[in-house]
């Protein structure tokens, strides 16, 4: 009996260790891939002007690293680059993503008015962009504009009725607004 218990214990331990090793290995690969993209894009964009997509990708990496000041500069360069390029559907999509990313970077720096302005610009370009609507509602909440936040969350729920964040926040805001 004690022998079986030891085998079970060791099997569970080996399983947990295997899971931990695999998780760490996956994280290392993900980090290396991101760092490779980061260094490649950064060196290219310091030598020459880039495309909207390249500026957006590098700015997104800076945002993930929580380097929001650098991200804001790159998001702005992406928008400027888009003005100089011939607009097609892909560029328009990246412009929308860029405005949302710019809003996120401003939000992270607690510059809510600028965040709201950029989220609205993203929504002007793509009115059914659920992520930007969620972000806009969150910025309204931080500014204590509860009725606008509730309205934005309700728009999210019209577009995506299963959005858990919008459901939870809308319920909470309904209580605040009606109280």
List where the protein language model places each region.
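Long, contiguous interaction/recruitment modules in multidomain scaffold/adaptor proteins
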Residues: 1-49, 53, 60, 67
């Amino acid at each position: 009996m004690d022998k079986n218990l030891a085998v079970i214990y060791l099997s569970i331990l080996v399983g947990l260790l295997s899971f931990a090793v695999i998780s760490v290995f996956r994280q290392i690969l993900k980090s290396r891939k991101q760092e490779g993209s980061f260094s490649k894009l950064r060196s290219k964009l310091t030598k020459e002007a880039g495309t909207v997509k390249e500026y957006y990708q590098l700015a997104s990496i800076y945002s993930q690293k929580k380097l929001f000041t650098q991200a804001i500069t790159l998001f702005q360069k992406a928008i400027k680059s888009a003005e100089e390029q011939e607009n097609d559907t892909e560029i328009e999509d990246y412009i929308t993503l860029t405005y949302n990313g710019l809003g996120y970077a401003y939000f992270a720096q607690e510059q809510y008015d600028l965040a709201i302005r950029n989220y609205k610009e993203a929504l002007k370009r793509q009115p059914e962009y659920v992520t930007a609507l969620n972000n806009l509602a969150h910025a309204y909440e931080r500014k204590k504009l509860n009725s606008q936040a509730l309205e934005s969350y309700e728009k999210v729920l019209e577009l995506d009725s299963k959005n858990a964040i919008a459901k939870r926040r809308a319920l909470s805001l309904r209580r605040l607004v009606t109280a």
